[in-house]
Amino acid sequence: MFLKELKLTNFKNCESADMQFSEKINCFVGLNGAGKTNILDAIYYLAFCKSYFTTTDKQNIRHGEDFFAIHGDFVTDNDETETISCVQKESTKKSFKCNKKEYERLADHIGKIPLVMISPYDRDLINEGSDLRRKFIDGVISQFDSVYLGDLLQYNKVLAQRNTQLKQFWENRYFDANLLSLWDEQLVHYATPIYEKRQAFLKDFMPIFQKYYDIVSGTTEKVDIIYESALHNKPMEQLLQESQEKDRYSSYTNVGIHKDDLIFLIDNHQVKKFGSQGQQKSFVVAVKLAQFDFNYQKIGFKPILLLDDIFDKLDDNRVAQLVKLVGNDYFGQVFITDTQRQRIQYLLDNIDGNHKIFEVEKGEVKSDE
């Protein structure tokens, strides 16, 4: 699958753009703040129904306008064209369509356009809270397992309802254990398969991740990702029962898969505490390349790969290795941003495969062709 054409209207700093892409490598060059990353974010939007960088859809509307629109024509491995479009107005909810047919649930679109983004913000995966690491593992699995995504959405819905019930108990100064157990049963129902699939995913993911870390880092360091969960020791039902008193007085569900975490290790040392800046950069890039490979093996066709400002992450030699790697036939369509035209041109001239370069300036996009 590849993105053939992308049209933007009032998306972030871009008033209007119409781009036709190479099936292999596409590069956006321009100064910082020109809008290169915004183009990658628009592509990401078409895959995940949301921005990679902002949490509120309306924040993506160009200043002074009242809507944005993104339209992408994707060519499938069967040589069929699928048009994905998103329109967000100030006054209405987001409209998301595939071939002019609007989705009833945005979750039905997830996995249709497999895609992996590598961004300087990925270091937050190491240094920030556990919610980002859960989002990572959930995002990878959801791209090839719609049942997992459905269970996860239902778990979060029931969790919110259980927390609301706990708050009502506290506010009304009464407690009904039987009523709470109804929510517990549903949490157990959804939590157990999610936990099991997270475990299975990491078991299969680790050898792929180690392979890419070796390539990116150029070292023989051993990396590991440890899945931390209270469900390792006790079933979800027992955890909820033992935490009932604490939950009652905190008005919050203190145990469950929503508290799970991933611990990142290099040679048995936590990357967050002891990893150098170079090790952290190599770690997150390798994680994302392994995500590409893992999803490719699972779904049978190549995800689109977005490389945002990779020179911020790696030194020039590592970047040259990375561009050469993603330029081979195993990888599919790739989008790259850089601030230096001469640098990216040199890298592209030293690999096989067709490519296209776009100049970006103040939200305006111009192709070499």
Model-predicted regions and their roles:
Residues 1-31, 174-304, 313, 317, ...:
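Conserved NTPase motor "head" modules and their coupling/switch loops across ABC/AAA+ ATPases, GTPases
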Residues 11, 15-96, 155, 170, ...:
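Conserved P-loop NTP-binding catalytic core
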